[in-house]
Amino acid sequence: MTPKKKEAVDSLHYETQHGQAINCDSLEYMKSLPDSSIDLVITSPPYALHFKKEYGNVEKHEYVDWFIPFAKEIKRILKDSGSFVLNIGGSYEKGTPTRSIYQFKLLVALVEQVGFHLAQEGFWYNPAKMPMPAEWVTVRRIRIKDSVEYVWWFRIIIR
């Protein structure tokens, strides 16, 4: 079935018999949704990168505080039987060949502050991913290309 485009006030909106895809400010949109009304939220938010992207991204030290409002809204709109799946990539510490742990700090905050349960973790293997940071991977060759990202599956109630 070909998705049909549906006009929306401030977003691109596609709908099929299987669900909807909405392109908008997700935090504002979630605020308009009723409690316990969604079965599944899948997201891959902007990563904490060293260089600014046109679509916007925050620094590693701000990342958890930036994402928590989204997580609280996701928890509010999820049904008790619902799932939240988060894809998040890693990052290096600026100027050093060492990895940041910002995504693990987020994982702990999602469980301890927001109240999600980590149901399962998975890994997305992306061999086409760019070799970043270039200084450590392609120039000095002291780190291998990072071709894996985390995919975390959260639940509110574990069954």
Located regions from the model:
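Core catalytic lobe of class I
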Residues: 2-159
